[in-house]
Amino acid sequence: MLDELVKFFVVLLVVVEPLSLLPILAGLTEGSNDAFRRRMSFKAVTISAAVCVLFAVGGTALLRLLGISVDAFKIGGGILLFMLAIEMVFARESGVRSITPGEGEEAHHRVDISVFPLAFPMIAGPGAIATILLAFAAVPFGSVQFFAQLGVIGVVLVLTLALMLVTGPVMRVVGVTGSAVLGRLLGVLLAALAAQFVIDGVRGAMA
């Protein structure tokens, strides 16, 4: 179980990629006071937590309702995560987690940026939702592993919030370039993990 928890933690942390949020948060809150940035950060993470728990609890039932097998979702989810990995490594916009220029312009004029673009698609976006569905699909509801995985989601979101609350100092130390380099390195790791999801799904479907 520990191996599965560590794998889930690594994949979810790489997918959420808290450091990549910081330049966006800094840009969208430029000219605003620290209280506004803190309020948006807390609200975005709270909304993201609700979305993550919703899919963790009801995701398996949704797959069953749609007649989608766990193996099929591993293949589809793995491909989605691989697309996200390509976006991270080559800094290309695959649409999995990025926003369009028009959406970015709209976000700049929003009074509340917590739901869009912070909570979705940056924190609880398609990649994070797919990762959660993959992790919880084969775990019995109410089991020790089920609650342990909820704890992993909590840890990732707390780390994300902690970084968002210190956006200014972190950006001064790491910078946009440092954040981009780290994102590319994590993208390579995510690509390998995504490929493993697809391999496991194909192997399970053929068994």
Regions picked out by a protein language model, each given a short descriptive name:
Residues 34-63, 139-171:
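A small-residue-rich subset of transmembrane alpha-helices
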